[in-house]
Design a protein with these regions (language model features):
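Alpha-helical transmembrane segments and their short interhelical loops
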Residues: 2-75, 165
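Alpha-helical transmembrane segments of multi-pass membrane transporters/translocases
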Residues: 114-170
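Residue-level signal for alpha-helical transmembrane segments in multi-pass membrane proteins
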Residues: 14-19, 79-82, 109, 162-169
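Short alpha-helical linear motifs
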Residues: 16-23, 89-94, 114-123
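Transmembrane helix segments
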Residues: 58-116
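Membrane-interface helix-boundary signature
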Residues: 32, 61-62, 92, 145-152
Length: 170
């Protein structure tokens, strides 16, 4: 799952960049692309570790199919794919901020939205930019402190190591 996830993500990124270039849209700098590659590998590591752990409990194809459907839908909500994180109730926002896959989404958003946020909020007060980033899940704020990208990287590394160890031990 780890290798396939990386291949599919890189494939999507490359073709997305080709498409954006063909229609005259903004194309990402090489610096951002290299960082995205790192996030892809890190995300695949953490996600495949969690999947390995969950799969270690499933014994039939039907159990796997049911778990995949439920987990896949739940993950969409918990990473802010369906509804912006800031529009969720406070207790759900708290849960999202401690969900490992949401840290992947934060890192992707920070890299992919960096240029457009800077450009679109250039004439806005800092408070508006800060609030927008929180609502859209570009940053996570814990007790009034904005988490750095490195906190998300560490969260994903720890998640990957812990869940791979648990999958092996189960």
């Amino acid at each position: 799952g780890f290798i396939i996830s990386i291949i599919m993500s890189i494939f999507t990124l490359v073709f997305g960049e080709i498409y954006m270039g063909m229609i005259g849209g903004a194309v990402l700098d090489m610096d951002i692309l290299l960082k995205l590659f790192g996030v892809i590998v890190l995300s695949a590591f953490a996600s495949s570790a969690i999947a390995s752990f969950i799969i270690s409990f499933l014994k039939t194809n039907s159990a796997y199919s049911a778990a995949s459907m439920i987990v896949g839908t739940l993950i969409g909500f918990l990473v802010g794919a369906y509804i912006p994180i800031g529009n969720l109730p406070e207790n759900v926002q708290w849960l999202v901020k401690y969900f490992p896959c949401a840290h992947s989404a934060v890192l992707y958003r920070q890299l992919l939205m960096k240029g457009s946020i800077k450009e679109n909020f250039a004439n806005q007060p800092t408070a508006v930019l800060k609030e927008t980033k929180e609502i859209l899940g570009v940053v996570f704020v814990y007790n009034g402190h904005t988490a750095s990208a490195w906190m998300s990287v560490v969260a994903l590394l720890i998640t990957g190591v812990v869940f791979y160890l648990l999958a092996v031990l189960v």
